[in-house]
């Protein structure tokens, strides 16, 4: 079985993230969305909330792929891959600046565990999009309805004003 992981903090998942996950689901038998837990990083949503938002976003997507699963990830992505027999990491690239960092990570992951990284170019309509930017715009009352899945929108608005 061809399996891949899409790692990230997904705080919250954006339409850009979802686009990469859906596209990856067409290329692999199973795609695991690995939601990272970093105790040193403050998040707007808890790990359980982020995982449930991702599950609902995938379930509510018009394609609703059945080969996407969501799991929590502690530590190195390559350790997550090794423990689950996953051979590939899928990463979305928004800009050349993303590539510089992600290439170094891909080479390190390959040297540590022989895990390959597949880079997918982001849909141009999401090239500027990041969870941090979405949270910032929402915090100031801006319209982010076109940037996040519907299931995320209500919770994001409630949390962003707290």
UniProtKB/Swiss-Prot annotation:
One of its GO terms (biological process) is coenzyme A biosynthetic process. Its cofactor is Mg(2+). Its EC number is 2.7.7.3. Keywords: ATP-binding, Coenzyme A biosynthesis, Cytoplasm, Magnesium, Nucleotide-binding, Nucleotidyltransferase, Transferase. One of its GO terms (cellular component) is cytoplasm. Pathway: Cofactor biosynthesis; coenzyme A biosynthesis; CoA from (R)-pantothenate: step 4/5. CDD domains: PPAT (cd02163). The record marks 17 as: Transition state stabilizer. PANTHER family: PHOSPHOPANTETHEINE ADENYLYLTRANSFERASE. Belongs to the bacterial CoaD family. Reversibly transfers an adenylyl group from ATP to 4'-phosphopantetheine, yielding dephospho-CoA (dPCoA) and pyrophosphate. This is Phosphopantetheine adenylyltransferase. It comes from Frankia alni (strain DSM 45986 / CECT 9034 / ACN14a). The lineage of its organism: Bacteria, Bacillati, Actinomycetota, Actinomycetes, Frankiales. The gene is coaD.
